[in-house]
Amino acid sequence: MPADTGMEKPTASPIAGAPASASHTPDKPRSASEHRKSSKPIMEKRRRARINESLGQLKMLILDALKKDSSRHSKLEKADILEMTVKHLRNLQRAQMAAALSADPSVLGKYRAGFNECMNEVTRFLSTCEGVNADVRARLLGHLSACLGQIVAMNYLPPPPAGQPAHLAQPLHVQLPPTTTGAVPVPCKLEPTEALSPKVYGGFQLVPATDGQFAFLIPNPAFPPGSGPVIPLYANANVPVSTAWRSSERVHPPAGIPGAGLDIIWARVVPASQAGSPIAERREAVWRPW
């Protein structure tokens, strides 16, 4: 028989068999950018959940306000819900304006005067602020002029009684600030009691000048005979201007300006002793959107 060698199988060392993770160092704290990247999917999921929840509530509110059966409109798209909400809010705004006019007939004039004041402030800022793109400035002022045309084209109030003060008529003033120190803006007045054609009056044309000022070109049929103009005028700072009048002379604009068929608007400069007091009309409180 072979001799017993007495050899034993080698056993694994407890140190060698220890897992490698036992010697792993703890994680370092993540930076803010890494934390944002890791939490971005969670934040996006929460944001979408908030949007969907708000749209669901808005859908129930708008269907209830429009008195529509929610079971027949159970699968409205998000765009449909938003469009229905916008239309409903516009109708509410018109209804509130009509109710305010029935309670106080001077509200519309105050609204126009307030919008005009805001437009003058925006125009003054754009004229004095440096670094504003000329195209952006022209588009913004063109949009404001279009909005002003829509406001002026709204239903006018009946003429005030003979004994009513003149300041209740709420004339509309439109003025652009000058870019030089030697000129002051002279507002031309359009009484809100005068009837204008809304289809024609809304079509203002904005023509920028080389010196940074802007001019509004108004079509010929926009003003019936005897009506006052709505256009910015400037006069010398030492001579006050009282009223403006409309001439039937036709204007031939320079080349490149689409202004054919327009009427020229003149201003009559009178001494201060003969001038009236139209400034008192603007002391009436105006409506402001803030």
Curated annotation (Swiss-Prot):
Residues 10-23 have a biased composition (Low complexity). Residues 111-144 form the Orange domain. The keyword Transcription regulation applies. Residues 1-47 are annotated as: Disordered. It comes from Gallus gallus (Chicken). GO terms for molecular function: protein heterodimerization activity; protein homodimerization activity; RNA polymerase II cis-regulatory region sequence-specific DNA binding. Pfam families: Hairy_orange, HLH. Has a particular type of basic domain (presence of a helix-interrupting proline) that binds to the N-box (CACNAG), rather than the canonical E-box (CANNTG). The C-terminal WRPW motif is a transcriptional repression domain necessary for the interaction with Groucho/TLE family members, transcriptional corepressors recruited to specific target DNA by Hairy-related proteins. A motif (WRPW motif) lies at residues 287-290. SUPFAM superfamilies: HLH, helix-loop-helix DNA-binding domain (SSF47459), Orange domain-like (SSF158457). Residues 25-36 have a biased composition (Basic and acidic residues). Transcriptional repressor of genes that require a bHLH protein for their transcription. May act as a negative regulator of myogenesis by inhibiting the functions of MYOD1 and ASH1. It is found in: Nucleus. Residues 35-92 form the bHLH domain. Its main location: nucleus. The gene is HES1. Keywords: DNA-binding, Nucleus, Repressor, Transcription, Transcription regulation. GO terms for cellular component: nucleus. One of its GO terms (biological process) is regulation of DNA-templated transcription. InterPro entries: bHLH_dom (IPR011598), HES_HEY (IPR050370), HLH_DNA-bd_sf (IPR036638), Orange_dom (IPR003650). SMART domains: HLH, ORANGE. Transcription repression requires formation of a complex with a corepressor protein of the Groucho/TLE family. This is Transcription factor HES-1. CDD domains: bHLH-O_HES1_4. It comes from the Eukaryota.
